[in-house]
Every structure is written in C-alpha cells, then in structure tokens.
Amino acid sequence: MHLALNFKQKPYIGFVLIPDKNQLWITDGKKTWCEKRDGTKYKPNLLNNKNLQEMTLVTSKNHGNEILRNLIQKINFCKVQIMGSIGCKIASIVHGESDIYICLSLPGKSAPKDWDFAAPESILKSAGGAITNLDNQELSYGKSSFQQGGIIVATNDKKNHPSVCVEIKKIIQ
C-alpha cells in the first residue's frame, strides 16, 4: 500500500506498507525510517555501489519486456532480484538490499500511474536516493493521464544518479 501527500505536484510525505515483511516505510519530507510491527525502528541503509556491473538490480516479476531483458543482459548486473510492487522495489533500495530499479513502459502498453510512484519516490529521495526518467528529469505528477511512461530509473545515490542514467542511455542506443 502506498500513500503520499504531494505539494506543488511533487511527493513530499509518504508511506509504503509492506505487510509480508512487517515494514512500514515513512518519510516526513526530511528523513526516512522504517517501523516494524513490534515497534522497532531503523534508518535507511543505502549501498554505495557506483559501477552498474557492481549493482544489484530490482525489477518486476510481471512487467518485463524484451527491451528490458536485453538491457539487463547487456549491463550484466552483479545480481537481479525479482519482486512485486514499486513500493517493495524502492524499499529494497532504501533498506540496502538492492541498488537500482529500472521501469520501462512501452508505447501502447499499460504504464505505472502516479499513485504507484509518489510515495516510493518521496521515501527514496529523503533517504538520499534519486528517481527520474532516463533523461534525468524529475517525474511529473498530476497529468491528466496519471501515467508515468517511458524509462524510469531509481538509484541509491542522488550524486551518482545522473551518470548512471547517461550510462544506461548509451547502452540502449
């Protein structure tokens, strides 16, 4: 479950609930933390892998396509983890279980919506990560279609994020 409060068309406060892991990821817009069902709290633990080949990719179990599979094969990530919702994928980055998430929506196919990305984005950004389209432009919310199409990249390091996008773009072209 994802819940976000957007301010000026950008997610600010967010909650991502992952019941099967007993995790509730929360951001107040300044910091991110996780609360377990027993009341235990812990902070983000983002990894510091800078090279794509050293990174662990988290990707979808249901929305893969041939272009994304080819990209994953060309990059030769250290490890690839498959899991469900965008919130789970972003939480895995913030928790230090993975480094990068790539979402590729093809024209004419179903694309993730604002409500899929808003809360996870707010949690990742306040933890020190970044999420943009492949051209390193921030996601835009509140469009009439509510769709977040194209290629979206989420990483564990906002400083290294632009160079990761450039590297992925070179591999695709």
Model-derived regions, located:
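DPxDG-like acidic metal-binding loop motif
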Residues: 1-37
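A generic local secondary-structure boundary/capping motif
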Residues: 2-3, 44-47
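Tryptophan-centered short beta-strand motifs
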Residues: 11, 40-44, 80
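Short linear motifs in exposed loops
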Residues: 15, 28, 36, 45, ...
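Flexible, glycine-rich phosphate/dinucleotide-binding loops
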Residues: 23, 33, 41, 66, ...
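Short helix-loop capping/hinge motifs at secondary-structure junctions, enriched
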Residues: 31-34, 39-41, 158-164
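An extended, acidic
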Residues: 46-173
